[in-house]
Amino acid sequence: MEYLEDNKTETFEEEDKEREEDQVLDSDEVLDSNELNDMQECLSQTDLSNIDNNRAIQQLSLGSMEFPSYTTNSEKEEMLLGLADNFWHQYTHLYPDRKPLFMCPRNECGVEKFVCTTLHPTLLPYSDLYDWDQSAKFVSEYLTMEPLNPPLELPRSLFSSTSVLQKQSGNCFDFSVLLCSLLLGAGYDAYCVSGYATREMCLMDEKRNICPLLNKVEESSWEIPQKPLKKYTVKPPRQLISKFAVQQEAKKQAKMEEALRNEQEEETRLKEDAEKPGPDNLHGLRVHCWVLVLSGKREVPENFFIDALTGKSYATISEPFLGVESVWNHEDYWVNMQDCRNGCKDMKFDLGDPVCWEYLLQGGSKPLLLIPDEEDEEELNGETIQENKTIFQMPPSWVLPIVIRPKEFETRCPQGRKILQYKKAKHEKWAPYLKRDGHVSRLTGYLDTECTQEVKIQDCFQNRKDKLDLREQNKIEQVTTEYFIPGRADSLKVHEYRSLAPETERSMMFYSEARLDGLQRRDEKPVEMTEIYQGRADFLYYRHIVFGKRPKKVAIAGGPTEANPRPILKITERFNRNKEKPANEDVAERTFLLTEDRIQLRCHRKDDHITTSYWEFLKPANLGEKDTPIVLTPETCISYQVEPSEKFSKQLYVYETLVTLQQAEQNSKDNVRKSETEVREILATRAQEEADPQLTISIYDTERNEKSKEKREAMERAIQEERQRRAVQELDYLAPFLAQLGDPEKLTLWQAQKVKEDCLSDMKQRLIEKANLIQARFEKETQELQKKQQWYHQNQMSMSKEDEEAYLDYCSEAMFRIHILETRLNRHKDLAPQKYLALEDRLNKDPRLREPFLTS
């Protein structure tokens, strides 16, 4: 491509002559915020819905406001189009068998634009879009895909990202250009790629792909870790079983498992063969566009692809990508010179390698890896400086700045809803506040590929007043699991149930750190209840309750359930070790057998013991009655003491222990009844919350928060009134000069002229003094820096590394101060005449110095 290089050199000479015109043009294209908003509003009124699937070019009416960059090309752009046209002709001449390049499509106004100038690097003010994965997810959700038509040809047009965002739809090229612009603005080394891909990727067909949300490993909760076996653990008794019989049974079992495994593998293979897509007659010919991210910037470890249609990332050797024709960014354009028979597996993405990639401009960010010939080495070395001065630079983007309003960013999906179909799964998304119950996502899993039989439904919620975050429904087992974020009054964290009716099987988990009783989990069955605690002062961590059948009583219709409570048969409580008590007196487990009037105690085991102390009490019938003698028999207290003590055998100790245990039993019964009441209240509250779901609105959401909006308007009115009041009470600038004359009610013509001259003279003097002060500080800083530099040159050879670093830090700070002073001085010189003229104008308009208020 030698002719292309000659053509570049000819254009370099014309570039110097046009540089001044380009600077004027660039300065004219700088828009302030009001003009930008007007342009965006006019562009949003452009009717883009009439463009058919073939994306036929139409001369669109952009309203009364003209967009020079959209409707015309600058001289620099025309020069670039000439270079691209020359490059394209040479390429088609040298490689007639290759497909044409995607270089100069038409925009929405029917004007040819080079693809590099369509990219507009933009960093939006949203932290979510600073990372590539969130940016790709946003683009894939915000836009609706339009397939290329025909799928074998490059599109004849490429719209600006502002038009694509307004229309909220586009083809793969529109998706990739928008995503690449966002990634470039976020600091990634990103490129658009024009090439070929599989049918499923080009058509965004994910019906044979597993949903990425289903690939996440579900965290197993509440699994009791198995304790490791200790060295002196008692071994189980030896089983007198024939080893030969065991071996034969193991072989038989292995054969059965192998046969079953082979059968399952064959069944899986048949299913996969049935689910495989049919042959594609256009395989390898379907045009596609995606994004390439090279390693280096933003700590990217290796190169990877991003499919902008789905937002997924792939390795550069992935099979869905079948070939690459060209890549480009906002600085240059590269054509692939490598063989793509094996797809992208063997490709190298070193864009500075001229053997693998042919560039359009040499001014790109990628250094050129060339080995000059020996005979041309001296000539090249002599011309390096001249060539660097004449490299053609890519003109600025013709696209308006990409703007996404907060409401649009929050809505994401077109019309606030989007449906994605996967293999045996369907994913539905909604914008926040679109649905009355705060529903934002639903993932439905199916048993068959036709998606007719539901297996599992996962619903996500946002902004719920009841703090509901996620609901999972298992359709096979008929189990519903709800997850809540912190903030509920009952501190509910997880609720797993089959029915919302009380006294049925359910499991509740709580935020224990937010509860006074430290309740962490409550499992309930029709006749049982188990509670797990954490961090209690009484060391209780486990309570198990067994209920009996409710006695048949005549109940009032609609009356409360607690009028006929379930009888409590047994309460078992377990406690952690209390180091302040001896192990022989520290209760580990306490069991109340209410129907038998028996209480069982088991103490903790000491570290050097293998048994524990055990107590069993039989409550006397008249225990707790006053003025009634209590008879303690040997059956009243049965115990086994690891370390016997005399006090344990005294009847007074037994009596006091019985009284204490009776009170503890009553407290446990009261706590059980409170737990039953709390469960009923939680179920009633949940039923009411589901019947009438309420949403919360953040105080920072100015669009939806009416109270915040009214308060903000009131504050603005108060600020405006305060400004007006201060303006009225502003100090009089003539007061010092009128005081010198005795503050007369009226001035003579001579006095008025003198006051005016004195005021202007004082203003002039203060402006001069301020300029002299800034100038003196500027000269002082400059002299000190010069002295420091002279000192450095004199002592440079004997200075340590720390002294050099300190000197460099001082120079940096000094240069910063000098720059600030110079800027302030220049600004003062520019503003001083304006301030003087403004004061003179105010004096001329002051009624106290004008004719009606003057005396003769």
UniProtKB/Swiss-Prot annotation:
Function: Component of the nexin-dynein regulatory complex (N-DRC) a key regulator of ciliary/flagellar motility which maintains the alignment and integrity of the distal axoneme and regulates microtubule sliding in motile axonemes. Involved in the regulation of flagellar motility. Essential for male fertility, sperm head morphogenesis and sperm flagellum formation.
Pfam families linked: CEPT76_peptidase (PF24656), DRC7_C (PF24671), MORN_DRC7 (PF24667)
Quaternary structure annotation from Swiss-Prot or TrEMBL: Component of the nexin-dynein regulatory complex (N-DRC).
Keywords on record: Cell projection, Cilium, Coiled coil, Cytoplasm, Cytoskeleton, Differentiation, Flagellum, Spermatogenesis
Assigned protein family: Belongs to the DRC7 family.
Stored SUPFAM superfamilies: Cysteine proteinases
Main localization of the protein described in the UniProt heading: other
Region spans: Disordered: 1-30, 255-277
One cellular component (GO) term of this entry: motile cilium
GO biological process, one term: flagellated sperm motility
Subcellular location: Cell projection, Cilium, Flagellum; Cytoplasm, Cytoskeleton, Cilium axoneme; Cytoplasm, Cytoskeleton, Flagellum axoneme
Protein name: Dynein regulatory complex subunit 7
InterPro entries recorded: CEPT76/DRC7_peptidase-like_dom (IPR056290), DRC7/lobo (IPR033551), DRC7_C (IPR056292), MORN_DRC7 (IPR056291), Papain-like_cys_pep_sf (IPR038765)
Coiled coil segments of this chain: 245-276, 661-733, 764-790
Comp. bias regions, Basic and acidic residues: 1-11
Biased composition (Acidic residues): 12-30
PANTHER family cross-referenced by the UniProt entry: DYNEIN REGULATORY COMPLEX SUBUNIT 7
